[in-house]
Amino acid sequence: MVSAFYAFLDYLKNIKAASPHTLRNYCIDLNSFKVFLEKHGKLSPSMPICLFSKERQETNLPFSLFTKDAVRLYILELMQENKAKRTIKRRLSAIKSFSHYCLKHRILLEDPTETIHGPRLPKELPSPITYEQVEILMATPDLSKYTGLRDRCLLELFYSSGLRISEIVSLNHWDIDFNSNLIRIRGKGKKERIIPITTLAAQWLKQYLNHPERAGVAKDSQAIFLNCFGTRLTTRSIDRKFQKYLRLSGLSGNITPHTIRHTIATHWLENGMDLKTIQALLGHSSLETTTIYTHVSMKLKKQTHNESHPHG
């Protein structure tokens, strides 16, 4: 069964173009289930599944242990361990995806997860920040330094286009057309889309790309955003920089790069952009995903109304 886990992870990586973050989560979730099955089947613990390991140890974990009862017991055990509902939901989702892969490749004849459902999650609306907070964040990088210029450019691009952090780090030189102010994005599942950027974002990009210090450190001739060693920035390093600027700006709350994506989507909607256009710009596969911003916009309107009304 462990070889099937690895085949599934290879499929996610090579065919479905899953991000390293997604692959890490799948490894964590499948390892958790594997440990449970080994314990449930009274088998000796084996090496954890690691997609990036050169050694892939096969074990005697039989598919006969992968039953509906086993999956139910596993979910029950997670609940008894007081795991968060979102964690339980994600782990069940990983097992279901693995099961569907096995059915598709005729490794399994029946789906052990078919009638099993995870816990219901409360609908959480994304919390955008205000125009004023966006301006405060933008003004934080030190523009006297090359790295500050790069980081201002990053922030401007996040807000200009609502890009995911993984889409920002994967940007290459040939993805940007300065004549039309358009950029080509490789989104989830290798789906490409072409979206506009603001004139201001284009100006910051040109200034950053033409900076002599950037040319001096560049080792990666393709990547747009480089670290101080001249290689492509990672999602983790951008996350760290983002948190640094939050501290320096004095802004409080749970604000992440993804918050900026939620923010510009909400601002687009408030300024009259239709949902289909927002869906295309954000790269949502379903309009239902985009519709959540109508609820966010209404929530903000109600909040503003209550705060501004004399009887509020």
Curated annotation (Swiss-Prot):
Residues 1-103 form the Core-binding (CB) domain. This is Tyrosine recombinase XerC. Forms a cyclic heterotetrameric complex composed of two molecules of XerC and two molecules of XerD. PROSITE patterns: CB (PS51900), TYR_RECOMBINASE (PS51898). HAMAP family: Recomb_XerC_XerD. The keyword Thylakoid does not apply. CDD domains: INT_XerDC_C (cd00798). The keyword Cytoplasm applies. GO terms for biological process: cell division; chromosome segregation; DNA transposition. Site-specific tyrosine recombinase, which acts by catalyzing the cutting and rejoining of the recombining DNA molecules. The XerC-XerD complex is essential to convert dimers of the bacterial chromosome into monomers to permit their segregation at cell division. It also contributes to the segregational stability of plasmids. GO terms for cellular component: cytoplasm. It is found in: Cytoplasm. It comes from Chlamydia felis (strain Fe/C-56). Residues 124-306 form the Tyr recombinase domain. Keywords: Cell cycle, Cell division, Chromosome partition, Cytoplasm, DNA integration, DNA recombination, DNA-binding. Pfam families: Phage_int_SAM_1, Phage_integrase. The active site is at R164, K188, H258, R261, H284, Y293. Belongs to the 'phage' integrase family. XerC subfamily. GO terms for molecular function: DNA binding; tyrosine-based site-specific recombinase activity. It comes from the Bacteria.
